[in-house]
Amino acid sequence: MLVYQKTKAEFLDDVLSNQVEVIIQDLVLKKLGRKTGQSEINSWRNSMMYMNNVLVDTHIPSDSGVSIEYQLPYAGLRIDFVLTGQDEQGADKAIIIELKQWSEAAATDKDGVVSTYLGKGLQEVNHPSYQAWSYAAYLNGFNETVYTDGIKLLPCAYLHNHPDNGVLTSGHYADYVAKAPLFLKSDALKLREFIRQHVRHGDKSGIMYRIDGGRIRPSKQLADSLASMMKGNQEFILLDE
């Protein structure tokens, strides 16, 4: 379900008004019937300021689409931020951006899992790149509009408070960072360049509206993967917040 859906220009105006977190909060209540805690409101305020800084760039079209808090159908999960538009050849692109407030994290010996301080203490959670990639994999596997219309999903993660200390980009997590690039505190310009590379023109085809209206139906690729998994090959993707 779409919650916040506007153009880049409108998003920048919402941030400039110092009301973006209130606007998102009101839309979450209106469309999802859910009240929001203060910590989540604060995270919206902070993260959207950082995304504003990245997107204030004339090379990123003002009519590209911005979706915030997109609800994955039947998954009970949400995508923090999606930027949509067309590339140089006119192909539809949707950049999925997982946003984190983390300022520190530690590696674990588990596949795709890190530990960080959340709420009451240290918790094990999915690596942000794994998380972003899993959302794209879900849509690629189940959303008929995505796989029939050839919409290219580009997952990544932006940890705007986390220093580049090598923990999250270590070899242990290299496979997931390759699938969903990780941008850290000092990487705002790199994220901007990543967006520039893939979104050269505005969203002319209502990409997120089409995705949101897409029928949930397993793709042939997913069916083949499930068949492979039943034969003993590991192709299972864990979805988790």
Residue ranges of model-derived segments:
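Accessory nucleic-acid engagement/destabilization modules that flank
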Residues: M1-G213
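Pre-Walker A segment
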Residues: L191-E241
